[in-house]
């Protein structure tokens, strides 16, 4: 039996409905799963979706919003968050096997008074999965983050021995699930030159190195050297200390669409690795390849997790 995958449409002012409509036309997607769509269905239909065989849960965003130019709005935040809540309820009740989330707008959530910084933060705090791990997957890259959406000035405060240990443990488990044959992992230092042995920074010496002593297959390197070695294919995964340390090389060097995967939840949750793209929303030119891969990856892992 095909896994049931809940697909949320994200912020209705963005490209979520468009990339979902395009993904639902993929033969591979329809063979891989039974989709359940949650969000503003009118937006989905505006991109030619009319398949009555697909079960939809409508979360209307309102006519007033649709007359405005694509931008962050309170209404968009409320609707996208409600869709996520519905999908989460279905997943935790076992009514779906996985969730794929189209992009939300964090500013819209902020305008709506929603305190979470994104999907991953919502799952961690609402359902008490503090160690749920943000991972990015493509054909040639498997990358995990220690810290995520925060000011760069605060990154070092969040890199603790406990956090580093949890990330390494979960990333090892995630790589086995994919599966990745090469178990060796690279860890990108926070500072240039790894702080030169404490000469100008101490995070590596005081925090990261002591935590990594427990892991024989994890190697700490300056981030430029780490990415260079990783792309040579000598390691199965790479851990980055902060967001852009991962996303810049990831989007530059990936040989296929990138998928975001939240590992450590009792179900599979993925998303395309891009945002709402307000600048092209409504123009019909959005690339759905990352969304398609997110659905296929979610379906694949959902089948594995059921066994």
Predicted ranges, named:
Residues 1-119, 161-241, 245-259, 263-276, ...:
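Contiguous, glycine/small-aliphatic-enriched amphipathic segments in soluble metabolic enzymes
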Residues 111-133:
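Glycine/threonine-rich beta-strand-loop-alpha-helix active-site module
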Residues 122-130, 150-174:
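Active-site glycine-rich loop that binds ribose-phosphate moieties when present
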Residues 135-136, 177:
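Short secondary-structure boundary/capping segments
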Residues 138-143:
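Beta-strand-turn-beta hairpins that frame and shape the catalytic cleft
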